[in-house]
Regions:
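Sec-dependent bacterial lipoprotein signal peptides
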Residues: 1-3
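Inter-heme linker and motif-flanking segments adjacent to c-type heme-binding CXXCH motifs
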Residues: 51, 114-119
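Short Fe-S-cluster ligation motifs
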Residues: 73-86
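Sequence/structural segment immediately N-terminal to covalent heme-attachment motifs in c-type
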Residues: 27-51, 79-82
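Electrostatic cytochrome c docking/interface patches
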Residues: 8-37
């Protein structure tokens, strides 16, 4: 799946055609590792459930993304989530996590995308 979907056109060139590891996205082991990373790096802002209600969320200039939202899940792509993890989001409190390996960034992506599956 090397081509870019229409929803990925707004990503920087290096991310538009990024190979999405579908096996990782559907892997229970990847999601388990992603959950551990989420609790370590993301839960303070996004909340342990990923609903955007973390301990630090109230003091932020913009509310954290609610990853449990089915509407959000339908409007995003794995490349967008991976990009946000690696590069942060300009104009928001979302920091870069370039210190994560590419594999762990995909593991975290897999977990984040799974949060809206049970809504």
């Amino acid at each position: 799946m090397a081509g870019c979907s229409d929803g990925d056109r707004d990503l920087p060139r290096g991310y538009r055609h990024l190979e999405v590891p579908q096996a990782v996205l559907s892997s229970p082991a990847a999601r388990t590792r992603g959950r551990a990373l989420f609790l370590e790096h993301c839960a303070l802002c996004h909340g342990e459930r990923g609903d955007g209600h973390g301990q630090r969320s109230e003091g932020l200039t913009r509310p954290p993304r609610d990853f449990t939202s089915v509407d959000w899940r339908r409007s995003t792509s794995p490349r967008h989530v991976f990009f946000a993890i690696r590069e942060g989001l300009l104009g928001t409190p979302m920091p870069q996590w370039k210190s994560l390996s590419e594999q762990d960034a995909w593991n975290l992506t897999a977990y984040v995308l799974s949060l809206a599956e049970h809504e």
